[in-house]
Amino acid sequence: MSTTDKIVYLNGNTLKIEDLINIGYRGYNVSITQEVEELIQKGRNVIDDILKSEKTVYGINTGFGLFSDVIIPPDQVKMLQVNLIRSHSSGVGTPLTPERTRMLLALRINVLTKGYSGITLETVKRAIKILNGNCLPLVPEKGTVGASGDLAPLSHLALGMMGEGKMYDFGDSGNTFTSNLDVDVLEYRNFKFSPANEILKRQNLTPIELNAKEGLALINGTQLITSLGAEAVYRCKVLAETANIITAMTFEALKGLTAAYHPLIHAARPHSGQGRVAAFLRSVLHSDQYPSEITLANKDTKKVQDSYTLRCVPQVHGIVFDTIDFVQGIINTEMNSATDNPMVFDTDELCGTISGGNFHGEYPAKALDYLTIGIHELSNISERRLERLVNSQLSDGLPSFLVNGGGLNSGFMIAHCTSAALVSENKVLVHPSSADTISTSSAKEDHVSMGGWSARKCLNVVENVENVLAIELLAACQGLDFRRPLKTTEPLEAVYQLVRSKVTFMDKDRFIQPDIEEVYKLIRSGQVLNVVNSILNKK
């Protein structure tokens, strides 16, 4: 894969999470090289040879699942593929967003470029034009059991490309839309849907016409799990870094002790993530380079150690970083894996097909369940830090609920309740979906991954964590205001100023939800992380 002038060149081997985010959220188009075209054609030649030989091969001239022993006559092999897509388009629920639909389609194209699916080059080229033209099928998010692949959502994707079902209708915008990863992330977008054939015609595009094996090639794979998982990993990486910054803000508001972050402590327990978090906290808290007036004024404190929610942050946040790194490796591999069945080979050892189980979603399912558990812990500990900010018995001099005139004003009282509610919700959502399996297809497909729900609930938890951390950051800035005129370090002052550019000090009760939303946007868009990095990178 290479990226040039907002074009991602797909080859089935080197696509990265950032590339997929660029395609989904930043409007990058996709293309393939002549070398990839030749690889796709090589795989298709194997299928054409099988058709000429009149051999019986699963998925080419047989039924599917329980009907795999039913032989399909040559004049019906194309209808077999059309029927497959129509019957398998059985999903329900909220449609995937335009961004996630783009990621889903791009990822499916990427695995097809490996040449193991036997799809025609013409179909791949049409799929690329459909993606680049933002002709995005309506894909319900529910309905996959994660083996044999994400059949229902990928069937809806294929159905739209066939000119059936519905597609997003962006009206007079030239079939473009404003993405919501980086700007106005909570802006309501009232998209409508129109018949797929009308959208394709409007863009002067021709629907895909399925040949033998092609319906199966378009739907047999883990691309829903993996594309949603890629977004989850991307957001978790930003979120984990931002959580360290927010922790430091709270640390300063609570007049924490930096001794617990001493490098000798973390060298004695050399987990990668733990050392990484401790080093970061040392880089933004009081130092010769970045002095903190709050820390200097507190140097004669009689306190000898902080609570666990401050003292043990490297140990708690650290494993989250290691979890993200592990899951990223699984997702990157899955993004570039052939997940079709049967798979097509043209080698010295074999020229033909082999039936296998690469479509089984257990790898990304288990990984994303693990990621969900890991990223949730950031909200668990954040809510406890928030309790210390709003509880005057724990906050070293801050007013109850971070507001003057308590009684008449309630301050952050119910913002803390919101945080607690989200954390409680997460504690249910972290139950691993992949611990379950239900036999399907008359016990032919008798073990499944349930990875679709693993991916979707991971994103649900990520959003909850983003909001919990937004509330903590808002409260930490309020706490720092009560420490004025003393200031914190330069990197943390930059975060404070960023927040205050959107949300003013709460001198009395006001409608607080818009404040939370503004800070949520700063976190989700990466602005909090960027403002700190811009200072640290000057060193």
UniProtKB/Swiss-Prot annotation:
EC numbers: 4.3.1.3
Catalyzed chemical reaction(s): L-histidine = trans-urocanate + NH4(+)
Compartment annotation: Cytoplasm
Keywords of this entry: Cytoplasm, Histidine metabolism, Lyase
Modified residues (2,3-didehydroalanine (Ser)): 148
GO molecular function: ammonia-lyase activity; histidine ammonia-lyase activity
InterPro entries reported in the protein's UniProt record: Aromatic_Lyase, Fumarase/histidase_N, HutH, L-Aspartase-like, Phe/His_NH3-lyase_AS
Listed pathway(s): Amino-acid degradation; L-histidine degradation into L-glutamate; N-formimidoyl-L-glutamate from L-histidine: step 1/3
Upregulation: Up-regulated by phagocytic stimuli.
Modification note: Contains an active site 4-methylidene-imidazol-5-one (MIO), which is formed autocatalytically by cyclization and dehydration of residues Ala-Ser-Gly.
EC main group: lyase
Crosslink site: 5-imidazolinone (Ala-Gly): 147-149
Gene Ontology annotations for the cellular component aspect, listed alphabetically: cytoplasm
GO biological process: L-histidine catabolic process to glutamate and formamide; L-histidine catabolic process to glutamate and formate
Entry similarity comment: Belongs to the PAL/histidase family.
Xref: PANTHER family: HISTIDINE AMMONIA-LYASE
Protein name: Probable histidine ammonia-lyase
Source species of the chain: Dictyostelium discoideum
Underlying gene: hal
